[in-house]
Every structure is written in structure tokens, then in C-alpha cells.
Amino acid sequence: SIFEQLARCKALIVDDFNPEDLNAYGATILFNLYELRLKRKLITCFTSNIKKTALENPQKPKDKLLFDRIIANTYIVEDSSHNYRKEMDNDFE
């Protein structure tokens, strides 16, 4: 299954992670996948525009368990450099 392939690959990158896009089912699947990868000691990298404070204080109860697990098991690197995506969006307007 796709889930098992994601659970076994050496490194998984969850790009542009945004919990607003997840329903309760999606949050549960992602939590289970991340938990399994942690047990297998596999690399999982999340990229996101979410600030650390938002991870520490989720607005929705469904996000708390996943966010707590991410915070407890990751290095959070905040990049406050120039937002090139926003600049590109403005070029197309």
C-alpha cells in the first residue's frame, strides 16, 4: 500500500505542511505514519510556513497530538529570510 511505502522509505519529506488542509481523518493518518516512522528510526522532514508558536498552541484539538509529537521529535529551524514565493506571486498580478 502507499501508506506502507511511505512508512518504509529511508527519508520522507512532507512539503508545505499545513494542518488547515487536514480533516480529522487526514490528521490521524499523518500521526500514525509519523509515529510508525519514529519507531523505525526513519528520517521525516516537514517544511511549513507555520511558526513554532502555532505548533505549540494549535487552534484545533485534532492538531494537538500530532503537533506535540512533531515538537518532541524534531529540530525546528525557523527561516525569517525573504519570502520569494510572495514576490513571485506579485510579479504575476
Predicted regions and their residues:
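Short glycine-rich substrate-engagement loop in P-loop NTPases that contacts/grips substrate
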Residues: 1-11, 21-28
